[in-house]
Regions:
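Short, Lys/Arg-enriched N-terminal segments with co-localized hydrophobic residues
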Residues: 1-10
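Conserved beta-strand hairpin/beta-sheet module of binuclear metal-dependent hydrolase folds
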Residues: 14-75, 163-166, 170-174, 276
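Metallo-beta-lactamase
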Residues: 15-19, 112-161, 214-220
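Active-site metal-binding motif and surrounding structural segment of the metallo-beta-lactamase
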Residues: 54, 65-112
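Active-site neighborhood of phospho(di)ester-bond hydrolases with catalytic His/Asp-centered motifs
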Residues: 59-61, 83-91, 111-114, 172-176, ...
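Short acidic active-site motifs
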Residues: 98, 303-308
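Active-site-proximal loop/helix segment associated with metal-binding centers of metalloenzymes
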Residues: 157-161, 169, 177-212, 256-260
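FMN-binding flavodoxin-like domain, especially the glycine-rich phosphate-binding loop
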Residues: 184, 195-233, 237-240, 282-298, ...
Length: 414
C-alpha cells in the first residue's frame, strides 16, 4: 500500500479495501451531538474513498473537524499522483466541508456531480464552476479499468443525493444510505466486528432519525439497488459491507416500509413525581406475567428522543403513559410525539395510560394527535385513567388494556 517517505511527518491512517480502492476517512470521537441534536457516545466516522485507476478518483470529502487527517490520507494514497476527479455524492457539510481544501491542493481536479448538487455547492460558497462536470441518472464515466454509473437518490436524505456504482467491481458508494453512528477504530469492514450485537442499534438509530422520514424514497433506491450486482457497499458513515449484504438490506426494507422488526413493546412514560411511572411499571409487570417480556421502558425526560424513535421503528407496539401538564401533553412527551410524526412512524398499535390530579386531558389529546397527525396508528380501545396515583379501582382497566394489547399481537397488521 502507498506510504509517505521515511522521515515525513504525515500520519496517514488508511485501509486498502480492494487492490486499487482505499478508505481515506477519519473518526470523530469529540463530537457530542450529530447534526447538533443526536447524541453519539461512540463517535462517528466520516468516510471517503480513493480509487487508483488510470485516472485517480476521490469519492466525497469529510467533515471540517477531521479535515487534516482526511487530507493526509488522500495525499498518502495518491503518493504524488494528481487527483483527476472528485465525485460528490452528497453535499451535506459533514461530507463536503473539506471540498475547497481538496481543490486548493489540486487545481487539476474535475468535480463530478449532478445539477442540484452543484447548486447546493454554490450556496455553501464553493467555487466549482470552472471544474464542474454534470452527470445525471444513468450516466457513466470510465476511468480506466473501472466504469462508474451514477444513480439518483433524491431525498435519501437530501434532494441532491446520488449514489455511484462501480460496475467493474460491484462496489456501491452509497452516500448516507447504509450509514451507521460509531467511530470505526481501525475496523473498516462490518465483518471485522460483531455487527448485530455491537452496531445494529446504532445503524437503526442513524437510519430512523436521519433518513426515517423518507421511507418511500429509500424504497425507490432499494428497488434500483436490487437490479445491481452489489458486492460491496461503501457508505459515508460506519463500516463497509462486503459480506452478509442481503441481511443488512432486509433491515432497510423493514425500516423504509415502516414495518416492525419484531413483536415487542416500547413503553414510554412521562412522570413528575413517580406516580405515572408506577402505573407504567405495573402495566409492564402484568404484560410480562402473561408472557410478553419483550418490553423496553423509558423515562421520556431522561432518555434522548433519538433512542425512543429507534425503538418505535423496531417494535410492533407502543404504550404512552403521560401526566397532564398545563391542561396539555407533558412537554417531553409532546416532543417525542412530534418526532414520531416528523419521522413518519406508522403502522403501530398504541396503548394509552393517562394521569391527572384534576382535568385529566392528556389521554384524549394523545389519542387525537396519533389519529389526526400520523398514519396507520391503531389505538387500543382499552386505556387506563389515573387520578394522581393508581388505586385498586384501576386494576380492571389495567388488565383489560394488557389483554387488548396481547390480543392485538395475534392480529396481522395490514
Amino acid at each position: 500500500s502507498p506510504h509517505t517517505k521515511e522521515g515525513d511527518n504525515n500520519m496517514e491512517c488508511v485501509r486498502k479495501l480492494t487492490k486499487d480502492l482505499y478508505w481515506v476517512g477519519a473518526d470523530d470521537r469529540r463530537l457530542e451531538l450529530f447534526e447538533n441534536i443526536h447524541p453519539i457516545p461512540r463517535g462517528v466516522s466520516y468516510n471517503a474513498y480513493v480509487l487508483l485507476d488510470e485516472k485517480t478518483v476521490l469519492f466525497d470529502t469529510a467533515d471540517w473537524s477531521v479535515c487534516r487527517q482526511f487530507l493526509e490520507n488522500v495525499e498518502a494514497v495518491l503518493a504524488g499522483r494528481p487527483l483527476d476527479y472528485l465525485i460528490v455524492n452528497h453535499v451535506e457539510p459533514d461530507h463536503a466541508a473539506s471540498l475547497q481544501e481538496v481543490l486548493i491542493r489540486h487545481p487539476e481536479t474535475k468535480v463530478i456531480s449532478n445539477e442540484k448538487a452543484f447548486d447546493l455547492m454554490r450556496q455553501f460558497g464553493f467555487s466549482v464552476d470552472d471544474r464542474a462536470e454534470v452527470v445525471a441518472e444513468g450516466d457513466t464515466r470510465k476511468f480506466g479499468k473501472h466504469t462508474i454509473a451514477f444513480v439518483a437518490a433524491p431525498m435519501v436524505h437530501w434532494p441532491e443525493a446520488m449514489v455511484s456504482f462501480d460496475t467493474t467491481t460491484g462496489t456501491l458508494f452509497s452516500a448516507d444510505a447504509f450509514g451507521t453512528f460509531g467511530a470505526l477504530g481501525g475496523r473498516i469492514f462490518a465483518d471485522e466486528v460483531n455487527f448485530e450485537r455491537d452496531w445494529l442499534d446504532d445503524a437503526r438509530r442513524y437510519y430512523t432519525n436521519i433518513v426515517g422520514k423518507y421511507g418511500a424514497h429509500v424504497m425507490d433506491l432499494l428497488k434500483k439497488a436490487s437490479a445491481l450486482e452489489i458486492k460491496m457497499i461503501c457508505p459515508l458513515h460506519g463500516p463497509v459491507w462486503r459480506k452478509n449484504i442481503p441481511w443488512f438490506l432486509d433491515k432497510y426494507v423493514h425500516w423504509a416500509s415502516y414495518e416492525p422488526e419484531e413483536k415487542g413493546v416500547l413503553l414510554v412514560y412521562a412522570s413528575m413525581y413517580g406516580n405515572t411511572e408506577s402505573a407504567a411499571s405495573v402495566f409492564a409487570a402484568r404484560l410480562a406475567e402473561k408472557g410478553m417480556s419483550n418490553i423496553h421502558m423509558y423515562d421520556v425526560s431522561k432518555t434522548d428522543t433519538s433512542y425512543l424513535i429507534s425503538d418505535a421503528f423496531k417494535y410492533s407496539h407502543i404504550v404512552l403513559a403521560s401526566v397532564t401538564y398545563n391542561l396539555n401533553i407533558y412537554p417531553k412527551m409532546m416532543t417525542f410525539l412530534d418526532h414520531m410524526r416528523m419521522l413518519n412512524v406508522q403502522n403501530r398499535y398504541v396503548g394509552i395510560i393517562e394521569n391527572g390530579s384534576w382535568a385529566c386531558t392528556v389521554g384524549t389529546l394523545m389519542h387525537d394527535y396519533l389519529e389526526d397527525e400520523m398514519k396507520g396508528m391503531t389505538i387500543l380501545q382499552d386505556s387506563v385513567t389515573i387520578n394522581s396515583s393508581m388505586t385498586k379501582g384501576q386494576n380492571r382497566s389495567m388488565d383489560d388494556m394488557v389483554d387488548a394489547l396481547l390480543d392485538s399481537m395475534k392480529e396481522e397488521k395490514k
